[in-house]
Amino acid sequence: IITVAWTGTVCTNPPMLYISVRPERHSHKALHETGEFVVNLTTEKLAKATDFCGVRSGRDMDKFEQTDLKKGEAKKINAPVIEDSPVNIECRVREEVALGSHTMFIADVVHVTVDDTYMDEKGTFHLEKAAPIVYSHGTYFGLGESLGTFGYSVRKKKKKRKNK
């Protein structure tokens, strides 16, 4: 398990994402050799384990044992998933790009597992129910309230109808 601050979407069709990892990290070698990884969405409930996995090396310990996170099997790749996570994104590395302090691993998304708890009857994922966290400059934050949906800044307001 590695906690990665630098990650994001690269492309939606085909689905791709990236993670950036320092070459001196223990996980860097495993990423390079296996070419596979899982991005596990982390939440407020998992914040302490997330931090632990970011500051302790897996070189001499099993982070699953140390954090009591539940280890599961991925569906399409040979890397473990964190079952406690509401979303597991299985990835296969397409390209490695050395970028100074970090190597960017650009990967194809090969499978996504989502906990049904966070899905509605229409198949929509409700991120706010999962209570994800973000990390910025050494601090973890919860996301809080939704500020708007895509395009809300330009959407025309509906006019009120007058009753006749």
Regions found by a protein language model. Name each.
Residues 1-164:
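Basic, polyanion-binding surface patches
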